[in-house]
A protein has these predicted regions:
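Substrate-binding/active-site clefts of carbohydrate-active enzymes
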Residues: 28, 341, 345-352, 379-580, ...
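Solvent-exposed segments in extracellular or luminal domains encompassing
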Residues: 210-223, 838
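Basic K/R-rich, polyanion-interacting modules in nucleoproteins and related proteins
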Residues: 246-285, 337-396
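Active-site-proximal helices and loops of the catalytic beta/alpha 8
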Residues: 253-254, 437, 445-448, 473-475, ...
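C-terminal outer-membrane/trafficking sorting elements
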Residues: 867-881, 885-956
Length: 956
């Protein structure tokens, strides 16, 4: 066999390099280097071709910056960059030199270029640099050059003085060829040696030198496995190799989609699946995974339907119960996870998820890049315990909006479950979870979705989420998921598969997204909800969580955005009545109710009232934002505090469909503004903590006296007073809006805050249990300082009254009839004549009168049966939470002593089961136990500390 050396191709010019040892997929001609085999201590010139890869920076005028770091032996994954240079979105980053024609270069010595500000400068000598990692950007960071599959770009470094080899052409993004075609193979070695090329095991070319070229021919369809071998010769010489695979595509007869097949994984039995991908306008697709070394293989080429829109593959003989990672390779260059995956592996973010949060997480596989989907035929089914749950009447919903990250310090579903007793005692009968499907990163509100059917692993396992829902149902609490179907972010394969890199937006031919959003409030990529593909996606999402996780409904984020009516530049017009949007939501609601009767359709709509009336009267529940009105009132400015819009009757609706709230995740916390901006005079100072907390009692008394579904935001019942815009460093800035906020379970030990909790609890119980609070006959007079609500019902009449002013107010309260009425909170009675009574109310005082005597709630600051969920500590005793504790728990007590203290965990007979040592944080002695000691069975235990401190702890 004759070989020839392509000196012209392998001269002194910079060449593309294949990434070896970190990620087997090559970055191809996106990056080239001189020398061809760079080392960490020698000068290397790197050339970036902006027209290659994702091509996002092609034609973008300079300056172009490198965002770069290194992958070392200490990196935990291919995306674990070390010693990153520069700050994103600034000019404090390495500037590339323009060479023209979309080419940019930079030169440096890697060992000293990174970590340059250290003393001594450079990457520590003990740390091995395996590769250089890059993405490239414009100044603002709004346009980013990456690999074709959206992953980072890598350039390997090599050990000096050793033999290395690399296949330079074909590159990793050039793995598909046509039968009968030719391709010029180019390989190189770091020193003169014996080079040989094998194709499917047979040697087809040899040479002695540092490069080898050969014209490959592909006479027929099939796999062509290429191996480049470099043999230094001599005794003890080690042969080194580089490999790649090409697939010659033959003609493919159209195959109909198997009946009943939907996008994603279709489980046929415990060992057989059908994978289906909807990918119109694509030419071919392969399934990749460990079963084919993440390389295209003719055996795993997907069938295509006659309309060239669907690709599918049946896989048999799989191991039941085994998790199998997989991806799709589309058009030979787009490597994506299954957009309909129910579980993914993320090389950038999974490494930050503690094993206690997600035990036994499947490791990210070697041999590929980007997000990977996971299937599991024959997966064990979750054993549901509470199968007879009856959903509460929507008119009586007391919904608690909760963000897992900011509700429990562990950020885990399991510890939310530990706290359900707290919510049950509060009177909650519906838990609304902020988005729990996969979103970008691990630390987020969740409104940046990437995979709509996969549960985000940052909060726990899929079964942890199911157990939380199951436990809620066991306590009479419905569960609603916040789902984000207005948009998806860039990690979504639905966006990546049809992407306009030049304009950094969805392509015009995307079957899912609008290239340009239709309204000004859009974030991410705007779904086209009139597209059949998007409608199928929405249907799948709705069905998946209702059926697989048994949720009770959805809060649809930004539901007003489900429209193709273009209102860009005219936000006011966006809220106008939109008949197409109404029809879409009716279709969604009908579909949900057909799948799961009486499931909740909750819309964050905030459109004009005429449209909301139609949707509400159809049976949907619509968010009613009364934050401004209630906060004006609690701050002591009653003139601007009419909250009549919390009433469906005030809106002219026929059904009680307004889910009114004073606080939500998206609004400023009432107590923060009370303390910062509350009214002050000689009588009242709302900026005083106890005064502000006392005024907060007005909120549940009035909000929960209005018939219809209601919502409160987490810890509002305790007077949470950190701003929505609080930053981790304690400052307040709008850029920190979605950052993590302090988790303040210690509020429950403050008597004034616990009193507020009990007022909320009492009103919540009335709202969900007393028929009068769901009456259709009620009246609001809430415009002035003294506000009133009247409920008329055959079972009982109710009058709520309160002084929202900061001055003493005299007023006349109107009653539905004459006779004796009873103050619910005090037990006092009043006799009503002429349907009125005269009152003089101090600032912030509230009254709730009922025509039937009810047992007054126990609001005393001593023990209350509603507190049994937690072992309430006496002064100086230990605080233990959560309690009961399924798994981990935290113990603490106030202390000025900075020295570590010893604690013991004992059983009720006094036998010591474990010993712990505390830390001091400047205010408290504390210790966190991530798990119970081995062998500890469910029961009651005692935590014993110094100076006789103790607390009871329950393991359920």
């Amino acid at each position: 066999m004759t070989s020839r050396v392509l000196k012209g191709l392998l001269g002194l010019g910079v060449l593309g390099m294949v990434l070896v040892g970190t990620v087997s997929t090559a970055t191809g001609q996106v990056l080239r280097s001189s020398p061809r085999f760079p080392t960490d201590t020698s000068l290397v010139t790197i050339v970036y071709d902006a027209s290659q890869g994702n091509g996002a920076l092609a034609g973008v005028a300079p300056p172009i910056y490198a965002h770069t770091g290194v992958i070392t032996n200490l990196s935990t994954s291919p995306t674990d960059w070390k010693y990153v240079r520069g700050s994103w979105g600034t000019t404090n980053a390495p500037l590339m030199t323009s060479l023209g024609n979309n080419l940019y270069s930079i030169s440096y010595v890697p060992r000293t270029f990174y970590n340059a500000t250290a003393n001594p400068p450079g990457v520590p000598a003990a740390e091995t640099i395996r590769s250089l990692a890059f993405v490239f950007r414009n100044t603002a960071g709004t346009i980013v050059g990456r690999a074709a599959d959206g992953s980072d770009l890598y350039l390997p470094l090599y050990a000096a003085g050793q033999l290395h080899t690399a296949i330079l052409n074909p590159s990793g993004n050039n793995s598909i060829v046509q039968p009968g075609s030719n391709l010029t193979f180019v390989g190189a070695a770091s020193q003169v040696c014996s080079l040989s090329l094998r194709v499917n095991g047979a040697v087809v070319a040899t040479t002695v030198g540092d490069s080898l070229g050969y014209v490959l021919q592909f006479p027929q369809a099939g796999n062509y496995d290429l191996i480049l071998e470099a043999n230094p010769g001599g005794v003890g010489g080690v042969v080194v190799r580089d490999t790649t695979r090409l697939v010659a595509l033959g003609n493919q007869a159209a195959q109909p989609l198997p009946p009943g097949t939907v996008e994603g994984v279709n489980y046929i039995n415990d060992s057989t699946v059908v994978l289906a991908l909807y990918a119109p306008l694509k030419q071919h697709a392969f399934v990749l995974g460990p079963f084919n070394d993440w390389s295209p293989d003719g055996t795993y080429r997907m069938n295509r339907t006659a309309d060239s829109a669907w690709y599918w593959l049946r896989m048999e003989g799989l191991t039941p119960g085994q998790e199998i990672p997989y991806q799709y390779l589309v058009n030979g260059s787009q490597r994506v996870a299954d957009p309909f995956a129910i579980k993914i592996l993320d090389p950038s973010n999974d490494r930050f998820i503690p094993a206690t949060t997600y035990p036994n997480l499947l490791p990210y596989p070697t041999g590929t890049s980007g997000i990977v989907s996971v299937m599991q035929p024959g997966a064990p089914a979750y054993a549901w315990q509470n199968t007879g749950f009856q959903r509460p009447d929507p008119r009586k919903l007391v919904t608690y909006e909760l963000h897992v990250r900011d509700f429990v310090g562990s950020r885990r579903y399991k510890h939310v479950m530990d706290s359900l007793g707290y919510l049950q005692s509060l009177g909650v009968n519906c838990l609304s979870l902020m988005p729990v499907n996969e979103f970008e990163g691990n630390d987020s509100w969740g409104y940046n979705p990437s995979f709509h059917l996969a549960a985000d692993k940052a909060y726990g396992t899929e079964n942890d989420l199911k157990a939380l829902i199951d436990s809620c149902h066991g306590r009479g609490i419905a569960v609603v998921l916040d789902v984000v179907m207005n948009h998806a972010f860039g990690q979504s394969p639905l966006a990546q598969l049809w992407w306009d890199a030049a304009n950094n937006r969805p392509a015009a031919n995307s079957p899912y997204f609008n290239p340009v959003p239709k309204h000004d409030f859009n974030v991410g990529n705007d779904f086209n909800h009139e597209s059949p593909a998007t409608q199928r996606l929405l249907h799948r999402v709705v069905r998946h969580w209702l059926m697989e996780y048994r949720v009770d409904g959805y809060r649809f984020d930004l539901s007003k955005g489900f429209t193709q009516t273009n209102t860009l530049g005219n936000t006011g017009a966006w809220g106008n009545y939109d008949a197409a949007r109404v029809a879409l939501w009716r279709r969604v609601a009908d579909s949900m109710w057909a799948m799961s009767p009486n499931s909740y359709v909750i819309l964050e709509h905030l459109a004009n009232n005429d449209e909301e009336k139609v949707l509400g009267d159809y049976g949907m529940l619509l968010w009613g934002n009364l934050n401004y009105a209630f906060n004006e009132g609690t701050m002591g400015f009653p003139t601007n505090s009419s909250f009549s819009w919390a009433s469906h009757k005030a809106r002219g609706w026929n059904k009680a469909g307004v889910m009114a709230y004073a606080e939500s995740h998206d609004e400023e916390r009432l107590m923060y503004k009370n303390l910062q901006f509350g009214a002050q005079n000689s009588l009242v100072n709302v900026r005083n903590l106890n005064t502000a907390l006392k005024r907060q009692e007005l909120v549940p008394v009035f909000l929960m006296s209005i018939p219809g579904p209601k919502m409160l935001w987490q810890f509002g019942e305790l007077g949470y007073d950190f701003s929505i815009n609080r930053c981790p460093n304690g400052t307040v800035n709008a850029n920190c809006r979605t950052d993590a906020k302090p988790v303040r379970w210690d509020y429950f030990t403050t008597p004034e805050r616990k009193y507020l909790y009990r007022v909320w609890s009492a009103m919540n119980q009335l709202h969900k249990n007393e028929p009068a609070f769901a009456t259709d006959s009620f009246f609001l007079a809430v415009a002035g300082g003294i506000k009133q609500i009247r409920l008329v019902h055959p079972d009982m009449h109710v009058v709520a009254a309160g002084n929202w002013d900061v001055a003493v107010r005299q007023g006349i309260l109107l009653f539905p009839d004459n006779g004796w009425y009873y103050d619910y909170f005090t037990g006092d009675s009043v006799q009503v004549t002429n349907f009125t009574i005269n009152v003089i109310l101090d600032p912030g005082v509230h009254k709730l009168y009922t025509s039937r005597r009810l047992s007054p709630p126990n609001l005393a600051l001593g023990h209350n049966e509603a507190d049994d969920w937690w072992e309430t500590p006496r002064y100086g005793d230990l605080e233990v939470y959560p309690n009961p504790a399924i798994e981990g728990f935290t113990v603490r007590w106030p202390s000025n002593n900075p020295e570590p203290q010893s604690l013991q965990l004992t059983d009720v007979q006094g036998r010591v089961l474990d010993r712990m040592e505390t830390q001091h944080d400047g205010q408290y002695q504390w210790v966190h136990c991530s798990s119970w000691p081995a062998g500890v069975s469910p029961g009651v235990y005692i935590i014993r500390g110094p100076q006789g401190r103790s607390a009871r702890l329950i393991r359920p």
